[in-house]
Amino acid sequence: DGTKSYSKDSGDTFAYITSGTYADGWFYGSGASICEKNADGDIVASPTFKGERVANTVEMLCQLFYNSNYGVYATEGGGPVHQNAFGQGRLLFMTDRARVSHYRLAPLDFDDFLIVPCPKYDKDQERYYTTMGNPFTLYAIPSDTDNPKMASAFIECFASEGYRIVTPAVFELSLKTRYVDDPVSAMMYDIVRANIVYDI
């Protein structure tokens, strides 16, 4: 009870605090997805979206946030609440984007942390799952474009080059060197990258 309020709030010390979309990693970490392609190539709702793993994960998080003293869901303040708590040493784990280590934790002179992938659903899950996060960019081609095939080819080319050339460079030159300075976190980034999933 770091705030001496005699009630649980985001100013206390916890194992885990999250808010908003920062909890999405748990959904994807369970192996679930929102949509997928069917046998005809059409995008449909994934059966995992309402599956048992998602229900169990939500129940586990609700127990953590509302029925224990180990976690809290911050309803006000968004990401800075858990980012600052982590940087002040009041938080054991947080889920967030990689850039937080550079722009939020570094100014707090907090560098005693490790990167780990989102936990597996259970010990039987074969691999980790990491989503790119909700702030990723989606591209569309206007219906009145003069040459939709060429526009599609252009976007596909840049997506391919980004995946094969840009993404490895970002991981090797930024995430594994600029954002962390220990070999264990660098290895963890290799695990994260090897298990990235896209929800389409």
Regions found by a protein language model. Name each.
Residues 9-15, 67-70, 88-92, 108-114, ...:
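Loop/turn elements at helix/coil->beta-strand transitions in domains of secreted/extracellular proteins
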Residues 20, 25-76:
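Glycine-centered hinge/linker elements that transmit conformational signals in sensory
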Residues 58-62, 83, 151-159:
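Non-transmembrane alpha-helical segments in soluble domains
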Residues 62-69, 156-163, 197:
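Sec-exported extracytoplasmic/periplasmic mature domains
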Residues 79-94:
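Short helices/loops that flank or line small-molecule/ion binding pockets
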Residues 96-101:
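Beta->alpha turn/N-cap motifs
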Residues 106-177:
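Extracytoplasmic/periplasmic substrate-recognition and gating elements
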Residues 184-200:
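C-terminal capping/gating helix-and-loop segments adjacent to ligand/active sites or protein-protein/ligand interfaces
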